[in-house]
Design a protein with these regions (language model features):
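Basic, glycine/lysine-rich polyanion-binding surfaces/domains
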Residues: 1-169
Length: 169
């Protein structure tokens, strides 16, 4: 329901499919994706793919960590698809705690942690996800002004230790 307030003059409907769907995310997409066994659509596109005989919705996206994938999988197929990606494509599977450590080491913000409705994306480290060529999004004028005049007041920083490297493992 909260998406409706961000929808401006679009002819669309929303459906909560979370009961029967699981989302799998792939970060640090390797350059060679032939081992996946399916073709990736262009970045920014959604496609229906078959993974190990199971139909999935796939979003190929760009993010602050580089190219990535989001897979929507029927909940009954999720474990098999995850196993396939781990064994066939050689992708390591990590839990929530390991992922949180990975993103914090790289100063990557997350919704519910560093990002919320009151968060300025340029101050949170999510500026790379803002497209300044696109039209009309909520807060666009404020963000564009901060960017144009280089007036960002805060940025994530490392208090100690050495950088982990962008998208590294």
């Amino acid at each position: 329901a909260w998406l409706e307030k961000y929808t401006i003059m679009e002819d669309c409907t929303y459906e909560d499919a979370s009961e029967g769907t699981r989302q799998l995310s792939v970060y640090n997409l390797p350059d060679d994706t032939a081992a996946f066994g399916f073709d990736l659509p262009p970045v920014g596109s959604v496609a229906r793919v078959v993974i190990d005989g199971r139909e999935c919705e796939l979003l190929h996206h760009a993010s602050v960590t580089g190219a990535g994938l989001r897979l929507l999988v029927p909940i009954g197929d999720a474990d098999a698809v995850l196993r396939y990606l781990e064994e066939r494509a050689g992708l390591p599977v990590v839990g929530d705690e390991a992922f949180a450590l990975w993103r914090i080491e790289r100063l990557l913000p997350a919704v519910g942690a560093e990002l919320g409705e009151e968060t300025n994306p340029l101050e949170s480290g999510a500026g790379g996800a803002v497209d300044f060529r696109k039209g009309c999004f909520i807060g666009q004028e404020v963000i564009a002004r901060l960017d144009s005049y280089d007036k960002v007041q805060r940025r994530p920083c490392r208090a100690g230790g050495s950088p982990a490297g962008r998208g590294g493992r």
